[in-house]
Each structure stands twice: as C-alpha cells, then as structure tokens.
C-alpha cells in the first residue's frame, strides 16, 4: 500500500511542478512562494481548528490534527525551515531553467536520501531494489547530460547551483520526514509546517522583496498559483501516509516520488515547447524501468 501511495504522490508532484513553472514565468518568485504558503495553510487550517475546538468531529479519522505542546512543535518548525530553504532555491532555479532540466537535477534527491537512509536508519535493499536504484540513477544522469545540448553550462550557471541546493535540502527534508513519521501523526506535521511557513515568509517578503519590488520582475496574479498549493498539499498528504507505514522505506519512497519527472516532462513537451525531447524521452524510459524494479523489490 505504501508503494502505491508513493506512485500517487509522484503523479501529483508532476502536476505541482508544471503549475509552479507556469506561475513563475515572467513573475516575481518570492510573492508566488508566499501565496503558495498562505493557500497551503488555509487548506489545513480548518482541520486544525475543528480538531482543537470540536475534537469529536474528526476523532479517529485520518484528518484529525492532534493537539500537542511545544516539545513537539519545535520539531515541526525545524521542518518548516528546511522545506522553505529548499523551496526558495528551487523556485528561483525553476524560473530561469527549462522544466526538462530542473526535473532530472531534482531527481538526484533519492541518491542522497538512499545514502542517508543506509547510514542513519540502517535500511538495506534487495537485488531488485538495487537494480531499480542503479537504473534510476543512470537515467537521471543521462537526462541531465541531454540538457547540455541546450547551451546550459552546469559549472558556471548559478541557477543550476540553486537547483542542486534545492535537491540537497530536499534530501535532508526527506530523511527528517522519516524520523518524524516514526513518532508523530502525519496530519499534525503537514498541517502545522504549512502554517509555520507563512510566519517565516512574512519577514522574507517584507525585508527582501517589498523594498526592491520596483527594481525586479513585477508580480502578476496567475490562477495556477492556487494549483501549486492544491497539488502540493495532496502530494504531501499521500507521501506522509506512505511513510507512516511501519514497513515503508524512505529510500524507495523518495526514489518513486522522483518519477514525477515523467509527468513534468510531458507538460514541458506539450505546453512549454521545450527542446531536445527525443534524447530525453529515451532516458525517461530508463526511469520507468527503474521504477518497475523498485516495485518488484518491495513485494
């Protein structure tokens, strides 16, 4: 069941990336991110309030948000900072790079998570899982090389560096999620970390963007900004429940979630008219084969 949830989360993440790319086209990055945190928190705020003031309504359901103290909230605040750091780097990078380049670089996260999971949680992979992991790593590497044909110098492009930092902090977030899910309710973590991100973003907007807003790309409203929040919240909700299963493996869940690159690739080809699709499509077939071996290895 947890593997099915991981694949569902991957599909939702692909839509999230596509809506994010559209929202950031010729738009100010920080306001888009700020609105995303607001809409995401508004989605979960009713569940927080109902659980606190009318506890019997959601009691025992997957939408219940347990009432906890500071000793728990401090761990969720840490997650908020980690995730927001990854998002800031990722949003700036995605604005300036093709979606079919960003996807493969983001797909290196499972490699980092795999190493971390083996070191921190003692996870061990069977033969099928190792085959799946190696195929996925190879395919992501080849897909990244295809991007060089578009004239993007990976060594000297600061936006590439931003995406790499987003992948690194995203991997740290994934490992931290596995730690949190061993002891905390998934709905508790997802609800409150979205709320805390709004408060973290307020000073960032006021100090970094607002004073210089007339000197940079102006902000424009786009309805796809709401789509970012909807697909992200749905993807994360499914993801947290996948990790809450006792036998779930963060290294596999993280790898499967990166198959969202397939969905974002389709959007990049059909809606954003990106280049070098033939060579990238061949690489994507390896991604799918790798995901199939991961599926075999978990049964």
Locations of regions flagged by a protein language model:
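Hydrophobic/small/kink-forming positions within alpha-helical transmembrane segments
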Residues: 14, 18, 45, 80, ...
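Membrane-interface interhelical linkers
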Residues: 1-21, 25-30, 35-81, 87-97, ...
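Structural signature of hydrophobic alpha-helical transmembrane segments
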Residues: 1-12, 65-82, 122-138, 187-199, ...
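Juxtamembrane helix-start motifs in multi-pass secondary transporters
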Residues: 32-33, 102, 189
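Alpha-helical transmembrane segments of compact multi-pass small-molecule transporters, enriched
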Residues: 39-43, 105-119, 196-203, 235, ...
């Amino acid at each position: 069941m947890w593997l099915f949830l991981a694949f569902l989360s991957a599909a939702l993440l692909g839509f999230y990336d596509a809506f994010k790319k559209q929202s950031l086209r010729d738009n100010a990055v920080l306001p888009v991110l700020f609105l995303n945190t607001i809409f995401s928190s508004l989605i979960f705020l009713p569940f927080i309030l109902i659980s606190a003031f009318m506890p019997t309504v959601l009691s025992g359901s997957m939408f219940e948000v347990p009432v906890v103290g500071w000793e728990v909230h401090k761990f969720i605040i840490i997650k908020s900072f980690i995730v927001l750091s990854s998002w800031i780097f990722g949003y700036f990078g995605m604005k300036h790079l093709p979606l079919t380049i960003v996807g493969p670089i983001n797909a290196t996260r499972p490699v980092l998570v795999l190493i971390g999971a083996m070191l921190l949680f003692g996870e061990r992979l069977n033969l099928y899982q190792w085959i799946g992991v190696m195929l996925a790593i190879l395919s992501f590497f080849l897909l990244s090389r295809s991007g060089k044909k578009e004239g993007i110098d990976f060594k000297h492009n600061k936006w590439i560096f931003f995406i790499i930092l987003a992948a690194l902090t995203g991997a740290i977030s994934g490992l931290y999620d596995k730690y949190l899910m061993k002891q905390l309710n998934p709905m508790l973590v997802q609800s409150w970390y979205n709320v805390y991100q709004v408060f973290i973003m307020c000073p960032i907007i006021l100090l970094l963007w607002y004073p210089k807003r007339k000197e940079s790309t102006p902000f424009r409203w786009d309805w796809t900004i709401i789509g970012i929040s909807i697909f992200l919240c749905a993807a994360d909700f499914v993801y947290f429940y996948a990790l809450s299963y006792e036998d779930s493996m963060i290294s596999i869940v993280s790898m499967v979630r990166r198959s969202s690159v397939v969905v974002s690739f389709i959007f990049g080809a059909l809606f954003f008219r990106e280049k070098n699709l033939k060579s990238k499509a061949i690489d994507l077939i390896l991604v799918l084969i790798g995901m199939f071996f991961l599926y075999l290895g978990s049964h």
